[in-house]
């Protein structure tokens, strides 16, 4: 069975403010269910490992969409005990995905283990994807891009 690595934030504050943030649940849950329904095994990892902070705004008002509500109703443990990024081997996975939320801008964007992981995926020509603020977590290594060809 093919495995997908989903890298999420460990950061729970909006910058240095007291305002809570973290993973935007909808951006995780919709993709998580899609991956599982497509026959993939999903491994969740974060810089600190353990419980993943969920942005409380993603649980308010109109935001908990159908996939988020399904994820919560299942009492799914996927976000309860993320693996530490330092323990992850990119060679073990077929693809890498970063869901959003504001947290990745503070921890993943500058995390050396994250840079090692995404570089490993690029070096192996494996797919890397991101949704919304998850793109801030992809410190694209310059060396992984070929020289442009001029014709």
Question: Could you tell me what each predicted segment is?
Answer:
Residues 131-135:
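Short, thiol/selenol-centered motifs that function as redox-active sites or metal-ligating centers
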Residues 1-124, 137-151:
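Extended, subdomain-level signal for the structured scaffold at the beginning of enzyme domains
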Residues 127-129:
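Conserved, well-structured core segments that form or line functional sites
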């Amino acid at each position: 069975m093919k495995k997908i690595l989903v890298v999420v934030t460990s950061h729970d504050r909006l910058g240095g403010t007291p305002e809570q943030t973290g993973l935007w649940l909808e951006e995780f849950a919709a993709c998580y269910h899609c991956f599982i329904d497509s026959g993939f095994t999903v491994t969740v990892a974060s810089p600190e490992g353990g419980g993943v902070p969920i942005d409380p705004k993603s649980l308010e008002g109109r935001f908990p969409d159908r996939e988020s509500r399904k994820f919560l109703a299942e009492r799914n443990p996927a976000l309860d005990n993320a693996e530490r990024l330092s323990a992850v081997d990119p060679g073990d996975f077929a693809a890498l995905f970063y869901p959003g939320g504001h947290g990745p801008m503070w921890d993943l964007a500058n995390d050396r283990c994250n840079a090692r992981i995404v570089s490993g995926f690029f070096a192996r020509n494996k797919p890397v994807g991101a949704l919304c603020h998850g793109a801030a977590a992809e410190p694209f290594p310059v060396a992984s891009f070929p020289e442009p060809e001029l014709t």
